[in-house]
Swiss-Prot record:
General factor that plays a role in the activation of archaeal genes transcribed by RNA polymerase. Binds specifically to the TATA box promoter element which lies close to the position of transcription initiation. Keywords: DNA-binding, Repeat, Transcription, Transcription regulation. Sequence repeats lie at residues 8-84, 99-175. The gene is tbp. The lineage of its organism: Archaea, Methanobacteriati, Methanobacteriota, Thermococci, Thermococcales. It comes from the Archaea. This is TATA-box-binding protein. Belongs to the TBP family. One of its GO terms (biological process) is DNA-templated transcription initiation.
C-alpha cells in the first residue's frame, strides 16, 4: 500500500479579476473561443498551454477548469490578464483564485467485494445496477470517494491535495476497522 499515489485529474477554480469586461472586445483577443450571448452569458476560451478551459464573464469573474495543478491555474489567469491588458483592461488588485474542486484518481492496490464494503461502511451508497462503484462520503474534510472492485478510487470535492489524502486515509481506516483490508497496511501511507 505504501506505493499508492493520488494523481490530479482536474482542478476547478473560481477567479475574480476585480474589473468589468467588455466581452465583445475580449473575444477578439482569445483564440479558440466561443461567445454566443443568446446561449451562454460568457466566453468559453481554451488555452493549449496550460491546457485549460476558461469561462469568462463580463463581471470579471472566471471559472477555470481542466487544470492539472494550481500552478496551471495561476499561469492561465496571468496569461489572460496579459491579453486583457492589451485591450485596455485595468485591474485594481491582484486576482483572487479560489479552488472549488479537485479530482484525484488512485489505486489502493487490492480488489474489494463491494457488497461487503457497502454492508459494512457507514456513509456509503452502492447501487450496482446504476453505478459500478461504492460512493463513500467523507464529512470532514468534505469529499466523495468512488471505490471500485479493482481497488481503483476517484476522490472528488476536495479543496486541496492534503484534504484528498485525509479523506482517503479515513476510507482506509474504515476499511481496516471492518476487516475489509489487512491490519497495519494503512499505516504505511
Amino acid at each position: 500500500m505504501s506505493n499508492v499515489k493520488l494523481r490530479i485529474e482536474n482542478i476547478v477554480a473560481s477567479v475574480d479579476l476585480f474589473t468589468q469586461l467588455n466581452l465583445e472586445r475580449v473575444i477578439e483577443m482569445c483564440p479558440h473561443s466561443k461567445y454566443n450571448p443568446e446561449e451562454f452569458p460568457g466566453i468559453i476560451c481554451r488555452f493549449d498551454e496550460p491546457k485549460v478551459a476558461l469561462l469568462i464573464f463580463s463581471s470579471g469573474k472566471l471559472v477555470v477548469t481542466g487544470a492539472k495543478s494550481v500552478e496551471d491555474i495561476e499561469r492561465a489567469v496571468n496569461k489572460l490578464i496579459q491579453m486583457l491588458k492589451k485591450i485596455g483592461a485595468k485591474f485594481s488588485r491582484a486576482p483572487q483564485i479560489d479552488i472549488q474542486n479537485m479530482v484525484f484518481s488512485g489505486d489502493i492496490g487490492m480488489e474489494f467485494n463491494l457488497d461487503a464494503v457497502a454492508l459494512s461502511l457507514p456513509n456509503c451508497e452502492y447501487e450496482p445496477e446504476q453505478f459500478p462503484g461504492v460512493i463513500y462520503r467523507v464529512k470532514e474534510p468534505r469529499a466523495v470517494i468512488l471505490l471500485f472492485s479493482s481497488g481503483k478510487i476517484v476522490c472528488s470535492g476536495a479543496k486541496s491535495e492534503h484534504d484528498a489524502w485525509e479523506a482517503v486515509r479515513k476510507l482506509l481506516r474504515e476499511l481496516e476497522k471492518y476487516d475489509l483490508i489487512g491490519e497495519g497496511e494503512e499505516e504505511e501511507w
